[in-house]
Structure formats: structure tokens, C-alpha cells
Amino acid sequence: MMNDIKVMNHAADNIRILAASMVEKANSGHPGGAMGGSDFINVLFSEYLVYDPADPTWTGRDRFFLDPGHMSPMLYAGLALRGFFSMEDLKQFRQWGSVTPGHPELDLQRGIENSSGPLGQGHALAAGAAVAEKFLEARLGSTMMQHKIYAYISDGAVEEEISQGVGRIAGNLGLNNLIMFYDSNNLQLSTECGVVMNQDTEMKYKA
């Protein structure tokens, strides 16, 4: 049962404010996407993702893969509300040697499942994790292994060929444990997506 909507909105607003504050203090970063994704990250971690904050490396946990690494402020802020990062950690966003770099780096103890790379790579890593889960489930049984893999990708990532290949593989293998959230707003870094690519993304993934 979902938490009270007022509580959920308040939590998401806190993530938004923290994300914007991190970028403002660092005088560097991308606030827009992180603020826009705050509701998603809050709902995912509070209502759907199965994990144990006391045992971040628990084998049976669900996994979340963030593809657009520049949206890291929303992830750090969301994880901070769950005890994985301190407010001091958030203040050190994008600073040399900090645990909150501009683009996330693998740190399972802090809830970071993947190092970000070129757009689309996180999508591929998520599909690989979904394949691994199916492999283990077939051998150990669904009682022990039945976790889900969540991925967050953006318009820019969908334009990359690596994502197209991942979509074909996921469909061919029937990876029903892979749940991809597509942040579709028809915008990329400097233009609308249609300026460089005109495609029916929904139909492409259905195919």
C-alpha cells in the first residue's frame, strides 16, 4: 500500500531541493533532469525496490541502474534520505575525492549499482544483471532468486545504438524481470530530439 500522497510529495520535494542545492553549491552540474526525476526515485525506493539498508550487498536485493550519470543528484539525495549518504556528503558533490562525484561510481555499500559511462551503457548493464538473475533463478529456484532489475534511461540514451541492441536482446530473451523507466520529454542537451533523430520509440520497443 502506497504511503500517504502528501508524505510522498513532501519527500520528493526534499529530493528536488537537495538536488538543486548540490548543483548550486558545486557551481557545476545538471539540475533539470535530477529535479524532474525526483518523484520517480522517491516512489521507486519507497514503494517498489526490495532492499535492506542494513545489508546493501544482500544477494536477493532488487537492483537500480541509473543510465544518465549527470542526473546523479537525484540518486544521491534519494539515498541520503535512506541513510546511505550524509548531508555533508551531499555538500561535497563534484568535489575532488568526495563520495558524491558528478557521475556515480560503483559503491554497493552506498546503494550505487553501476558506474555511469556513455549514454546507453547503464541500459546494457541492467540487461546483463537481468540475465544473471534469470540464470541464478533457474539453478537456485525462485524462492532464493526472484529479484527485479530497474533501469532509468533518457531520450539521449534511447538515441544511442547500444540501447537499441539492448532492447532487441531483452525482447528476444524475454527478460520480464527488467523494468525500464524511460524519461521521455523529447529534449536532449541542446535541442529537441527530433532535430537529430525522428523515430517512434514506443513502436520500436514493442517490436
Sequence positions of predicted segments:
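Generic start-of-chain signal for non-secretory N-termini
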Residues: 1-17
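Hydrophobic alpha-helical scaffolding
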Residues: 5, 9, 30, 65-68, ...
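Hydrophobic (often cysteine-bearing) scaffold residues that line and stabilize catalytic clefts
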Residues: 11, 15, 33-37, 71
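N-terminal capping segment at the start of a domain
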Residues: 12-28, 183-184
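Cofactor-binding active-site loop characterized by glycine-rich and histidine/acidic residues
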Residues: 36-173
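Short internal beta-strands
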Residues: 65-67, 177-184
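Conserved thiamine diphosphate
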Residues: 138-145, 186, 193-207
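Short, solvent-exposed loop/turn segments at the edges of secondary structure
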Residues: 173-176, 207
